[in-house]
Amino acid sequence: MKRIHYFDLLRCTCFCFIIFYHLLFQLYLSGICPVERLNPLFSNSNMHLATLGVAVFFMLSGASLSYTAKENFSLSKYYKKRFLRILIPFYILYIVYFLFLLFQSHSVHNIFPEGIPAWRIVFTFLGMDSWVSMHGISTFSLTIGEWFLGCLILLYLIFPLLRFFMIKSEKFFFIIATGIYLTVLFHYDFSVPIHMNFFLKGYEFVIGMMIGYYHEKFNPKWIFLSLPVVIFFVLCPFALPISTGLKITILAVAFWISAACLEPVLEKGNGRFLRTISNYSYEVFLVHHIIIYFITPRAIPYMRGMVGVLGLFLVELLLMAVLGFLLKFISDQCIAALSNLTAVENKR
């Protein structure tokens, strides 16, 4: 199947947005810089760099799955591949980070709140502990993958069902999905922030599914419509009188189309750089928050203005690259071993 180059571009861009935001926001949490000075670097009254990155990534996840599942879709192979690709790196990092925290604190009670029922470890096995914690339920979360991973795993679990209904009737499927989206959007009654809501993230996922299955390519002329929308959201001096959730969706779709229109240009290059970053993006995403959370507060004594901040970012990015590479290497070895073991068992 032909590789869609702008998928790589979007994946790299999304994770850069998310990591950049976390790098900056940790400066505030560590008392290095007031949030008022940082906010203009990643947000305004109409957009937020991290929420844009997350929204586009949910679209990208749906698009990638539906695009690769156009032909010879196997339910068992799908779940096996998703499980190995997502949960193996999560398990490895969770174990290593837990042992690291245990070595530091000398007690499990200093890592997790007391009184958590033992059965809730199942949320960790599913990779959904941080997402469940976001809803006020105590779990054994170490914040690896944050709420993002659990929400995405839920959508991966129901993807075959969504795909079935999408193929049955594209228009009816989209109308129902849009109806649910608008109902949730304009009658919002959830405790979680709107940009983290499962139904709104699910709608972005569905938009991506439909793009990946039916319309993965766009006429380059569409950029003359989409790019002005993106620029307007970034530069608009006043708050648009519409729902925050709607702003996120409109901007994410416009940003997607703008990137998609670059496909003819991207096809002319070899794409190795984007492809490499894209291949390691998930592992870097898993490790990045741990690195930022651990390194930034300890760098305070060495901060010397902007030069110190840039040096800190450089060190953290380098550590992300190294640890992300190691995590992927170890994960790939484990996945290969498990796949070989399964193949041997099937031959018996």
List the predicted regions and their residue ranges.
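Interfacial loop-to-helix transition and helix-capping segments at the boundaries
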Residues: 5, 41-54, 136-151, 187-207, ...
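Transmembrane alpha-helical segments and their boundary/interface "anchor" motifs
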Residues: 14, 47-56, 68-107, 111-127, ...
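Aromatic-anchored segments of alpha-helical transmembrane domains
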Residues: 16-23, 128-132, 177-189, 228-241, ...
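Membrane-interface helix-loop-helix regions
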Residues: 37-45, 85-151, 184, 250-259
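Solvent-exposed interhelical
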Residues: 153-180, 209-227, 304
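Alpha-helical transmembrane segments of multi-pass integral membrane proteins
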Residues: 232-335
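Membrane-proximal cytoplasmic C-terminal regulatory module of class A 7TM GPCRs
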Residues: 331-348
